[in-house]
């Protein structure tokens, strides 16, 4: 099964989860708008969510998949037990830390927040902290399934968390922000139990024999992801010193930016990690294939989101407590974020490819460059322009990081990039021609027209990618 076809299966599952996530945020906008309660919620879930990003989409899979795929029989079971036993102790310490020193974590993600926001966030953090352990177990199960080239169901499991949070949000009219917070915890538990079979089929050993060896590969990838996620910490802290609700603005806008990123960039990078881990001799072939696929989806997504940002935000969010002013601010933030979409797609693909061949140094240097650039640019743009400046800083930092990675890997499908860019510009021109009404539903028609035009011209100028997809599907 090709990278393209595997990525599309992954994307279908991710799309369902992201749509539920979008519906969840629509409900947030309706019930909470841009408020200190929602800011407190985002701060409280950021610690477990931060670890989920590190474990689920980064260090855990990047270190676990190559080592796990090398082992067989009893050694595979002992390796899995070692990782679970070793990390259980570490995560227990993190949970205890969050219970006894919640102020440290609150200040880590929202130092500039108001007193009432911090007080509420502290209460909510006590609810979300236990989810860390279940997120870790989910990440292990997720990695095992990916190693066996099973991508669809693992990618679908985050939908469970979105569903429980949605239920909690509906109950918020009676219980307030507490109910979606409890929904977050329940969702984390159910996510693990939905794929627990991949772990329990292995024989358990009371050992940490392989854990030190695993840490040698995990620690550099972990530090790479931590450095990458520092951007999120810095972003939230900078906007927390801005107007009340700025954290909420940032989260609302990032939802639409992360939709195509999760659908395409994360999907491709997850698949290419497994492909290269099992076929390292063809590193360049798999990397180029992955880059083409990433560009094929992220460039038109960027173009469409930039042009249609305002009608998209208005349609989904401008209800209840969310005002037209909020729409204008959020759409500008979305544009600033979206400028970096293709670059973060390339960044993710190349970084995971390096991890597959156990090269952790290059991704770490790239992550450090991105993080330092983001911190400097946050200070320059964020403190002056608030969440819009923070989003722009994120995009520019991603571009800088990609330039370093491209210089390092010395390969890039430039001809494919030009073809895809041309097709995307043609798509944009057609969307522009159809922009003749203020009907709030019309942008949906424009999206469908844009997709159709893009696919038609891609079939003319980019036949090889379409042909490879059809061939992979037949296989």
UniProtKB/Swiss-Prot annotation:
Topology with respect to the bilayer: Multi-pass membrane protein
Show the taxonomic lineage: Bacteria, Thermotogati, Thermotogota, Thermotogae, Thermotogales
- Identify the domain of life: Bacteria
Protein's recorded name: Lipid II flippase MurJ
Q: Which family does it belong to?
A: Belongs to the MurJ/MviN family.
| One cellular component (GO) term of this entry | plasma membrane
Where are the coiled-coil regions?
none
Localization of this protein: Cell inner membrane
Q: Which residues lie on this side of the membrane: Cytoplasmic?
A: 1-2, 57-78, 145-150, 197-213, 272-287, 354-362, 408-416, 462-475
Q: Which residues cross the membrane?
A: 3-23, 36-56, 79-99, 124-144, 151-171, 176-196, 214-238, 250-271, 288-308, 333-353, 363-383, 387-407, 417-437, 441-461
